[in-house]
Regions:
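Structural recognition of an alpha-helix C-terminal capping motif at a helix-to-coil junction
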Residues: 32-39, 52-64
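Acidic, proline/glycine-rich intrinsically disordered inter-domain spacer in sigma factors
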Residues: 4, 77-103
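C-terminal flanking helix
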Residues: 18, 38, 106, 110, ...
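Short, charged helix-capping/linker segments at alpha-helix termini
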Residues: 1-8, 18-36, 45-52, 134
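A short pre-motif secondary-structure segment
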Residues: 112-116
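Pre-recognition alpha-helix immediately N-terminal to the DNA-recognition helix
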Residues: 16, 97-100, 110-111
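DNA-recognition helix of helix-turn-helix
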Residues: 63, 67, 130-154
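Arg/Lys-rich amphipathic alpha helix in sigma70-family domain 2
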Residues: 46-50, 60-80, 91
């Protein structure tokens, strides 16, 4: 399968990638991570050999950029107070305590929750993006939700 022009790839996937980044890093830093994501994709695009699952490829790059962003941030203590119930997926990912807590989850759990509830991906696709089994993807989401409901952080 031939690769589409890069601009077409950008146009088709812009919203999904941006939603993921807003949930992963917040509105304030999403624009920078979005630009870094598509610059990295643009550099790698000519070397890409297959055109299957391009959205997954872009979301993987976005996930890596979000993780890089978190690594550059100063570490904050993890709150020990119980968290409110998990917000609906439509909740603004930049203005709730829940989404702040989501961003503090271990990287695979954070990504799994965002892929599932922001990008509405099936577990099969989440497993492919996280390079794990479908059962491990389900477990990552389950464990993350357990932590968000007030279980103690590891």
């Amino acid at each position: 399968m031939r690769l589409p022009p890069f601009q077409e790839l950008l146009d088709r996937n812009r919203e999904a990638v941006y939603r993921f980044l807003v949930a992963a890093v917040g509105h304030q830093d999403a624009d920078d991570c979005f630009q870094e994501t598509f610059l990295a994709a643009l550099r790698a695009y000519p070397r890409l050999e297959r055109a299957d699952n391009l959205r997954g490829w872009l979301l993987t790059i976005a996930r890596n950029k979000a993780l890089d962003h978190h690594r550059r941030q100063p570490q904050h203590p993890i709150p020990t107070d119980p968290l409110p119930e998990v917000a609906a997926p439509a909740a603004d990912p930049d203005h709730t305590e829940v989404w702040t807590a989501v961003r503090r989850l271990p990287p695979k759990q954070m990504s799994a929750v965002i892929y599932r509830f922001v990008n509405d991906l099936p577990y099969r696709d989440i497993a492919r993006l996280l390079d794990c089994t479908e059962e491990a993807a389900r477990r990552n989401v389950h464990e993350a939700l357990k932590k968000l409901r007030g279980a103690t952080y590891e």
